């Protein structure tokens, strides 16, 4: 592609972007937001350098000149992120349960092509509120079959996005307790809808490699393990903490997730977008 085509020639990238506007599917990371898993490293953001020593917000640890610089602390499953197999699969030579060759596959080894593709947006919002205190309602193969009866079979290479509607609870504290803290820690609130292991097997049988959800985890509030093992042991990729899936049609959008490239990461935060054809 020459410079004229890239800038705006017929069939150029600019033409595609004009036809397919970008939709941000990413939650906000911040100290007031429920962007980290309860009981894990909380997200922190601090000022390292301010423009001038006079009137500087605290804490300021350096004076480097007339610039603002901040530092952040986050674990590798903070905010929207992709789970690598090594998140739940130990190395094959560890002697631990569920150990396997994929236990050495970290976030940087996930191919970017696995994290972009046509989206199949499965609406399961009817399950909101169906769980008990600390318990998630299950997304089952029957939910997937019902969607396929309306939209056609899931296709190999599609990225399945489970639209639970749970992102409505992604709010600043204290309202944000309902997102993950109350379902997991206090057990005072219901859990988010989560796919049963059989549903993950069903999708894998359809050729699905990448699965996303607009909730804190693919795992359930009461069972984080079995949904993770079922997919990650077979090289599936899980994108968690999506938002705004209601802006995408069941089919017709293109999904892209670009993770940070962090050596040895068991998961990689990043930015997710959907590209939806502009309506006439």
Residues of each region from the PLM?
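Active-/binding-site microenvironments in catalytic and ligand-binding cores
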Residues: 1-280
């Amino acid at each position: 592609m020459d410079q004229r085509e890239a800038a705006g020639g017929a069939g150029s990238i600019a033409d595609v972007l004009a036809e397919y506007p970008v939709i941000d599917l990413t939650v906000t990371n911040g100290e007031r937001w429920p962007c980290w898993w309860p009981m894990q490293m909380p997200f922190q953001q601090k000022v390292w350098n301010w423009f001038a020593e006079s009137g500087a917000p605290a804490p300021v640890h350096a004076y480097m000149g007339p610039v603002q610089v901040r530092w952040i602390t986050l674990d590798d499953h903070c905010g929207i992120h992709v789970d690598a197999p090594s998140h739940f699969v130990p190395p094959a030579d560890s002697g631990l349960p569920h150990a396997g060759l994929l236990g050495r596959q970290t976030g940087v080894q996930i191919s970017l092509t696995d994290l972009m593709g046509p989206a199949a947006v499965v609406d399961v919002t009817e399950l909101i509120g169906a769980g008990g205190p600390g318990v998630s309602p299950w997304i089952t193969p029957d939910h997937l079959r019902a969607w396929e009866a309306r939209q056609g079979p899931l296709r190999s290479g599609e990225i399945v996005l489970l639209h639970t509607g749970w992102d409505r609870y992604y709010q600043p504290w204290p309202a944000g307790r309902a997102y993950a803290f109350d379902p997991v820690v206090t057990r005072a609130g219901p859990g988010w809808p989560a796919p049963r292991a059989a549903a993950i097997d069903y999708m894998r049988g359809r050729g699905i490699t990448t699965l996303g959800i607009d909730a804190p985890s693919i795992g359930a509030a009461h069972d984080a393990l079995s949904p993770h093992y079922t997919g990650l042991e077979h090289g599936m990729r899980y994108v968690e903490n999506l938002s705004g899936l209601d802006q995408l049609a069941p089919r017709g959008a293109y999904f892209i997730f670009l993770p940070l490239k962090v050596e040895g990461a068991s998961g990689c935060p990043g930015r997710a977008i959907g590209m939806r054809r502009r309506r006439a």
